Amino acid sequence: QPKITSSKIDHELKKWSEKGVEGHFDEDPWVSHHHKGKTAMAHLVGAKTHEVVAMNNLTTNLHLLLASFYQPEGIRKKMIIEKGAFPSDYFAVTSHMKQKGISPEDHLIEISPDENGYFSTEKICRSILTTGDALALVMLPGIQYYSGQFLDLKSITHAAHKVGAYAGFDLAHA
């Protein structure tokens, strides 16, 4: 972490201890902090500043995405994730399945990496195509957090769309 991080955090903690709720409205108000990084965030994702916002945390945002994009219907109930997914990602995925009455044991497909810890795009796409109409969502990382492997998002998305499924990517490590 940058050396200045500790002193910046200490400054905000001191402000909180001395001013409490008034810290939201003083000379450097907390109430508008979410605007400070908009230009950098927009540039990072290729968006306009009015199209981005810093909010929540990674797991909360994943829950929000799953609430919108995991919509099991008919035989289309399965979800594909990577074996060894980040623990909070795994729990978010399985909790959404259970909430919708879907058994993760029967409907969650975990793609395993090879012996070197890398995920084969061919294996992922083959699993997607084999699962076919039963697949509701592919939820994978953009960059796998153990190995740093960048997954082929375009090929995976193409395969998912070919069978009528959504493709979602957690870019927390990207």
Where are the regions that the model predicts?
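Pyridoxal 5′-phosphate
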Residues: 1-174
